[in-house]
Amino acid sequence: MTRNPNVAVTFQARMSSNVRDLVASGQFDLGIVADEIDSTGVAVEEFARFRVAVAMPQGHPLETLDVVHPSDLDGHRFIALAPEDTTRREAEEAFERAGVTIRPVVETPYSTTICAMVAAGIGVGLVNPLTAEPYLGHGLVLRPFEPALHFRTLLITPPSRLASRNLEEFIGHLRAAV
């Protein structure tokens, strides 16, 4: 932005499906969305991958583990991602393979909500570690989850529009930032 002071960037946080609709209609030049969206009407490429982590309140018994497995979560109050979330579905498969039944006390579409609830001591949950960074040292601890699962984010653009040089540069800066 400092290299192009006459270019304005508008940042809006919205549900992935809303972002997809705005990009498909040409109202947005690009969007960064969760991988479970319907990609009809947009050009799609993977933007980033982050390994799933288990978020737990500071001082939680699971904090003593180096890695958390599905069986370790059995019986703990679990804050889950929304049922349509790709990562949640993959986690449910991992729990099923391990013979573990997780009964969520809360469901939410956002890792940041899980982090806030975990920091408040409500339970544990699987989160995107990038989203959890502001909570580290503020009541929340992360441990890797095994088997390795990943949050995937997609970069979407209108399919029939060529990206401008400014947009290509901006996308490059976004990729470098993550």
Predicted regions and their residues:
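Flexible hinge/capping segments at coil-to-helix
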Residues: 39-52, 56-78, 164-165
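Residues at or immediately flanking beta-strands
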Residues: 6-10, 101-105, 152-154
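Beta-alpha-beta core module
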Residues: 39-50, 65-66, 112-159
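Alpha-to-beta junction loops
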Residues: 7, 24-33, 52, 100, ...
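Secondary-structure junction motif
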Residues: 62-63, 70, 76-98, 163-172, ...
